[in-house]
């Protein structure tokens, strides 16, 4: 099997050296070249024709985002962004994902060498995922048209969504058309701390419904979406007649915290047939067992189809496990989940 050919673009010589060490330590990949800036990278891409590009977000001579935008227009290829953990870094990274980057890794704030080498397996996994990702599914999506407001539903109704690689854009596409009369949505997207708040704030500006990073103990309200905070699990719990959110630091599940399975299992238990479960693009099997539990508890469950997924991992696992009622294209997810949640009952509250 041929090796995954990687090109790293970073203005830091140390980072280029570390990335080279990491990539070359894996037998299935090789660093074919490195570049200190996008202008040099342009020539190296033509020369070496890499399978995956790792790209520093903030660089001199040409901004990483400007370069990414041009690259995706002229020569689309899988890109993994390398980002700082700052507020600005998370904003820029989210924009990069919108422009077509497959995924990102964060630079440790202290001890770059030790920190990056500790990320060795994660970086390799993200490069492997990027090499297999569907670029056709990751073309920048146009804003979906707003769905008509349906009847107000019982506050017992809610939607649970899980996603990973490619999920930030898929979630935007699902939430943007939702009317204010939508039920509450609980969302687990695999993301590090610091990024989930920026992600929620970004969606809040784009959507009619309110979108926020979830807080422990807060009441779950219709017309709002709650994003699990990075590195913490989110569960649905009850307080009397009301739903509320439970945030905790339990151990990683399926190597993830937050974990989609943790959310889905809690929704199966607390909401049962009053819920709809949705599993979107992502690598691995997180969410498959939880989605089966939701289906067995009477919930309607949807999986994104392969053609519209950046990575058809999590949906495939959920389908194979028997947890999925219906497989739909990303463009139909919003409409279908609202139709299914409304089919049960329409109670004015």
UniProtKB/Swiss-Prot annotation:
Cellular localization per UniProt: Cytoplasm
Top-level taxon of origin: Bacteria
Activity regulation text: Methylesterase activity is activated via phosphorylation in response to negative chemotactic stimuli and is inhibited in the presence of attractants. Activation requires both CheA and CheW.
Uppermost EC category: hydrolase
CDD domains: CheB_Rec, REC_CheB-like
Residues covered by the CheB-type methylesterase domain: 152-344
Record flagged with keyword Transmembrane: no
Active site feature: 164, 190, 286
Lineage of the species this protein comes from: Bacteria, Pseudomonadati, Pseudomonadota, Gammaproteobacteria, Enterobacterales
Cellular-component GO terms for this entry: cytosol; plasma membrane
Protein family membership: Belongs to the CheB family.
GO biological process: chemotaxis; protein deamination; protein demethylation; signal transduction
Written domain comment of the UniProt record: Contains a C-terminal catalytic domain, and an N-terminal region which modulates catalytic activity.
Protein name: Protein-glutamate methylesterase/protein-glutamine glutaminase
